[in-house]
Regions:
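Extended catalytic cores of very large enzyme megasubunits
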Residues: 1-186
Length: 186
């Protein structure tokens, strides 16, 4: 932290309490500073306030009473904003979305498009959930006469993508693969 601030102070249209920094241990404060603070923020209370004001704003109108309550709840550690909200909400970096859901078509073009989409989604700050239920299982004939290797080898490619593309500056990408319970590869 750059300077020691104490007491209650107005910030972004609400009142924050710098004394609540004491509720966080050193590891938490260091992690917040390293990954979640935005430009001129020096304290966790400022990041909590930014996220609270962002979450209480709809179509350009901010409900400051709601923002104050959200700030109080997060600064008292009763709940915490998701990573994309705390790191990106109210800023110009990344997206304030926790999870994107996408569909994996059963074609080479569809798989290629899925990989490309994942690169952009992961680097924008959100986790990804991909539906693989339409991808043919291992050993099924393709229209070109070969046999499918199933969805699992293609999921390994997605895993490598998540290792390679970070969610902004906060963490590596995350991905959850979904399929139907009656899919032959389950």
């Amino acid at each position: 932290m750059i300077e020691d601030k104490v007491g209650k102070k107005p910030y972004l249209g609400i009142v924050i309490d710098y004394n609540k920094e004491k509720k966080l241990d050193k590891f938490s404060l260091d992690t917040l500073q390293d990954r979640y603070f935005w430009e001129n923020e020096t304290h966790a209370q400022e990041a909590f306030a930014r996220a609270a004001v962002f979450a209480a704003t709809y179509k350009g109108e901010t409900d400051f009473e709601l923002a104050q309550r959200l700030y109080e709840y997060s600064s008292d550690l009763w709940f915490m904003f998701s990573t994309p909200i705390l790191s990106n909400g109210g800023t110009t970096r990344g997206l304030p979305i926790s999870c994107f859901l996408n569909y994996v078509p059963d074609s080479r073009r569809g798989l290629s498009d899925h990989y490309d989409e994942n690169i952009w989604l992961a680097s924008s700050g959100g986790g990804i959930g991909g539906y693989w239920g339409e991808v043919r299982s291992n050993g099924v004939a393709t229209r070109h006469g070969s046999r499918s290797t199933g969805s699992i080898p293609f999921m390994h490619v997605v895993d490598a993508e998540m290792l390679a593309f970070n969610q902004g500056t906060t963490r590596r990408g995350s991905y959850a693969a979904y399929s139907d319970i009656d899919h032959p590869e389950i």
